[in-house]
């Protein structure tokens, strides 16, 4: 049996050993290999693309299609360019209705450029390919992004090209032919003059999310296979002091590069706690520029200098939580006003507090709340009824969890015949679809309680899924779930007996609010970690599952089954002949 009562230090990332790193200024110069340190795969892919014998002129990069990411990739590509500043392109001379092209002799020529990297997250046809304009008989040619990137690299978001397929077809043609032809965007309105084509050589980096890449692969299967591929790594694993330093330097660089205040020495632990909540891992921190910039932008209004303190960051996070917390508070009020029935004291047979995460479309913050699961057992033919499934409110994953739970129980009891009980399980006061298996451990405990006729401690909530051997498996949304139950207990008054049971594998995901951490430190709230569902049963039902020289839950259930089977044997004649049972010896 493995039951771990977690200390308050287990509930947040450990930052005490990194105080010396936090005190450093984390200055970065232009030649700092920060990008290659944090994005080694993407850096290597860029090197391959810029090689003189590159296997393809196209590169696919999995990354959010936002300007912050495109600019990061562009800056990294610029540092790798060996021919940067080389004059390429030409000059179009317009004389009346005659246009001719000559080689560029200076950067001032209208279609000349110094080899460079150009990035755009959204473009229209004229912006990408340039255009011919005519006003009062005068003709002018305007270069597009492909001309600006001539001899260099064009970085563009995939959603632009997927939304405008003709742009992609023309861009691919230009890259493959290494030549730019002037054509009319509207076939009904041809160009008023003939414009000579020009040599144009560039490499293209297509940036997209997983869905965009999948759509592009379907549209261009051969090119997708041949293109160089890499990904922007959006998280950094914290394995030692060096990786912590690396992350601090990345955050500082992102803030300074965007003219925002960077974290001060005492702000780093607070930022790391919030970062761990974002990634869902104590030892995984985000590299997302958008996430970092959001924190720095919101706290900037609270500080005057070029750094912000831990107190200022805490205040900003509290303000954000309050600003976004109306919906969560209303849901808590429903429980506190007993419109949704959740008990946090006492005992009930076949009733348990599970934990759920609520996400509303359009709402920026997920929040947790307890869910009451009930189980009723009666004499029957061994059928387990999932009411959610029967009412078509249960998803496939939830149904799978129910079947796994039943398989564990039947295997443990080792019955030679069908169990003489039927059971029904449901999420009480749940009126929308339920899916996922994160409540399967709670459902199993409720079922065992009902079968054994032993009450469940209502002061304790539980989350986690189980496999067919009863092992507790990790689930998501852990911080929100625990904080949701804690908020209800706190509003009703903490008794010191309340707490939450979680799978041991979930401990590494904890990054809880300071108020909850303080309650655990003071012994007013408890969090237990278990490896197996049988470890949770003594906490919830005050009886062990199996053992010698003591009353156990398995023994209690088997005795009830034996009694029910004996009664069933007595009534094996049809009702009109029931009097014959009197002649059957006991």
Give, region by region, the residue ranges found by the protein language model.
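Peripheral, non-AAA+ core regions of ATP-driven protein-machinery
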Residues: 1-3, 9-11, 15-24, 44-49, ...
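Conserved ASCE/P-loop NTPase catalytic core
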Residues: 2-217, 229-240, 249-311, 316-371, ...
């Amino acid at each position: 049996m493995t039951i771990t009562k977690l200390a308050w230090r287990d509930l947040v990332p450990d930052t005490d050993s990194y105080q010396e790193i936090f005190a450093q200024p984390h200055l970065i110069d232009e030649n700092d290999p920060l990008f290659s340190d944090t994005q080694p795969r993407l850096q290597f892919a860029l090197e391959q693309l810029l090689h003189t014998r590159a296997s393809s002129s196209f590169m696919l990069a999995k990354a959010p299609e936002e300007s912050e990411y495109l600019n990061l990739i562009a800056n990294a590509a610029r540092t790798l360019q060996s021919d940067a500043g080389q004059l390429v392109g030409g000059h179009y001379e317009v004389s009346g209705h005659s246009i001719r092209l000559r080689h560029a002799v200076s950067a001032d020529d209208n279609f000349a450029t110094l080899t460079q990297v150009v990035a755009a997250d959204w473009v229209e046809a004229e912006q990408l390919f340039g255009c011919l304009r005519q006003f009062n008989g005068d003709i002018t040619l305007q270069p597009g992004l492909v001309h600006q990137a001539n001899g260099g690299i064009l970085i563009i978001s995939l959603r632009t090209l997927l939304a405008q397929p003709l742009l992609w077809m023309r861009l691919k043609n230009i890259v493959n032919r290494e030549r730019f032809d002037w054509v009319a965007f509207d076939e009904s309105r041809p160009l008023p003059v003939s414009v000579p084509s020009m040599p144009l050589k560039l490499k293209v980096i297509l940036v997209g999310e997983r869905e965009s890449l999948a759509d592009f692969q379907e549209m261009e299967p051969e090119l997708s296979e041949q293109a160089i591929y890499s990904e922007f790594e959006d998280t950094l694993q914290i394995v030692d002091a060096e990786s912590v330093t690396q992350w601090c330097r990345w955050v500082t660089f992102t803030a300074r590069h965007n003219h925002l205040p960077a974290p001060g020495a005492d702000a780093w632990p607070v930022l790391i706690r919030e970062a761990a909540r974002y990634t869902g891992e104590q030892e995984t921190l985000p590299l997302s520029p958008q996430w970092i910039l959001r924190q720095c932008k919101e706290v900037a209004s609270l500080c005057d200098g070029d750094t912000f303190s831990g107190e200022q960051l805490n205040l900003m996070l509290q303000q954000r939580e309050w600003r976004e917390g109306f919906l969560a508070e209303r849901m808590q009020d429903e429980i506190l006003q007993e419109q949704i029935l959740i008990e946090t004291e006492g005992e009930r047979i076949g009733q348990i507090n599970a934990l759920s995460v609520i996400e509303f479309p359009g709402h920026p913050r997920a929040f947790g709340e307890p869910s009451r699961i009930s189980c009723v057992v009666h004499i029957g033919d061994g059928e387990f009824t999932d009411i959610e499934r029967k009412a078509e409110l249960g998803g496939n994953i939830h149904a799978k969890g129910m079947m796994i739970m039943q398989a564990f129980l039947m295997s443990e009891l080792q019955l030679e015949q069908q169990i003489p009980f039927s059971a029904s399980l449901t999420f009480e006061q749940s009126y929308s679809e339920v899916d996922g298996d994160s409540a399967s451990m709670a459902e199993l405990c409720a079922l065992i309680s009902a079968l054994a006729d032993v009450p469940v401690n209502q002061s304790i909530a539980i989350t986690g899924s189980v496999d067919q051997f009863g092992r507790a498996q990790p689930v998501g949304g852990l911080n929100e779930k625990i904080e949701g139950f804690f908020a209800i207990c706190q509003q009703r008054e903490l008794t010191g007996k309340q707490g939450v049971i979680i799978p041991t594998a979930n401990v590494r995901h904890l990054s809880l609010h300071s108020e909850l951490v303080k309650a655990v430190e003071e012994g007013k709230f408890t969090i237990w970690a278990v490896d197996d569902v049988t470890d949770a049963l003594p906490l919830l039902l005050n009886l062990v599952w199996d053992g010698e020289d003591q009353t156990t839950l398995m023994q209690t259930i088997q005795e009830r089954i034996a009694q029910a089977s004996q009664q069933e044997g007595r009534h094996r004649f049809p009702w009109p002949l029931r009097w014959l049972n009197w002649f059957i010896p006991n």
